[in-house]
């Protein structure tokens, strides 16, 4: 077993260290979100001519393309490093001197090659877990902005014809009962509703435009809708994705190395960032494969498998900052 000094050298990244790594990506999304909002606020959105609108939307597309490149760079730089940190942490606990070794030193066996492929595949999949969701979110964001601009202009056109919502009618009543309103029936976005309300209150096109952009600034640029129907803005969604995958990369590196070596038990490290539903597993022993669940090891019980703990609590789920280390019986 390695010395205490060796183990300390190969400790997992702390939640604060992983947060700093994640922030390198999500801060870029926050910056672009601010630039997008400034682009939307420039001029009167309700009276943009087609050429000017195309110019603005082209700027939006360029910003989002740059974000895709930033995401790719962050992924290529940090995901392999985080995964290796997990490997090295396992080595520090399980290998003499913290050095990795294969089952058959001095030669490559089919098993060794298989494990090497497993590590490469794990890193590839983890990288996709960052790149694909954020690329899809950026694409959704571009489509949503274009859609909001088109709807805002249509709303201004209707208002210009004197088509305001009569007193006593709800927005939905008006949309359902007027031919022009059918075009706007699917408008449920709060920023567009703020513009619609502004027109209903007799505000000018410029005032309604400012209301629209102001509400958009308050809510952030939408880029993702989850299964519960909640809308995420660019910065909050990218921070969740980057933070979650950063923790996953380190954890999978550690667990895969342990499987490679033939070890099965991990201990969940407590953290002090905030209280969460997964705190019940702090300091508890978990089985990577599930084969050790219920066993008593070194006077401590293995309470669950890693998969069961994830399924029944928030442990190792989105935004969870817990980590695990190998459990060694002296």
Q: How should each PLM-predicted stretch be described?
A:
Residues 227:
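Electropositive, gly/pro-rich neighborhoods at or near active sites that engage anionic ligands
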Residues 223-224, 232-330:
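Acidic, glycine-rich two-metal-ion catalytic cores of nucleic acid-processing enzymes
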Residues 1-224, 328-330:
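N-terminal leader/targeting and assembly helices and adjacent pre-domain segments
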């Amino acid at each position: 077993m390695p010395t205490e000094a060796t183990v300390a050298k190969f400790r997992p990244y702390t939640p604060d260290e992983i947060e700093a790594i994640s922030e390198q990506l999500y801060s870029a999304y926050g910056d672009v979100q601010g630039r997008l909002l400034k682009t939307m606020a420039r001029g009167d959105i309700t009276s943009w001519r087609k050429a000017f609108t195309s110019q603005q939307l082209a700027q939006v597309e360029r910003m989002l393309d740059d974000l895709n490149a930033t995401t790719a760079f962050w992924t290529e730089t940090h995901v392999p490093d985080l995964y290796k940190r997990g490997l090295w942490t396992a080595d520090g606990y399980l290998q003499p001197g913290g050095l990795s070794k294969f089952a058959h030193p001095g030669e490559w066996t089919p098993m060794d090659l298989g494990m090497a492929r497993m590590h490469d595949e794990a890193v590839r999949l983890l990288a996709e877990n960052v790149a694909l969701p954020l690329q899809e979110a950026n694409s959704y964001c571009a489509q949503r902005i274009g859609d909001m601009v088109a709807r805002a202009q249509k709303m201004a056109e209707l208002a210009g014809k004197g088509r305001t919502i009569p007193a006593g009618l709800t927005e939905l009543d008006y949309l359902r009962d007027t031919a022009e309103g059918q075009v706007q029936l699917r408008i449920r976005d709060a920023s567009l509703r703020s513009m619609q309300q502004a027109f209903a209150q007799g505000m000018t096109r410029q005032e309604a435009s400012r209301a629209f952009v102001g509400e958009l600034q308050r809510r952030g640029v939408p880029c993702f809708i989850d299964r519960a129907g909640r809308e995420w803005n660019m910065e909050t969604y990218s921070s969740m994705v980057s933070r979650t995958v950063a923790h996953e990369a380190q954890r999978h590196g550690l667990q895969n190395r342990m499987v490679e070596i033939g070890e099965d038990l991990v201990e969940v490290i407590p953290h002090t960032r905030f209280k969460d539903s997964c705190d019940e597993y702090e300091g508890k022993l978990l089985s990577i494969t599930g084969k050790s669940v219920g066993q008593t090891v070194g006077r401590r019980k293995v309470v669950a498998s890693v998969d069961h703990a994830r399924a029944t609590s928030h442990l190792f789920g989105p935004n969870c900052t817990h980590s695990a280390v190998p459990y060694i019986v002296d």
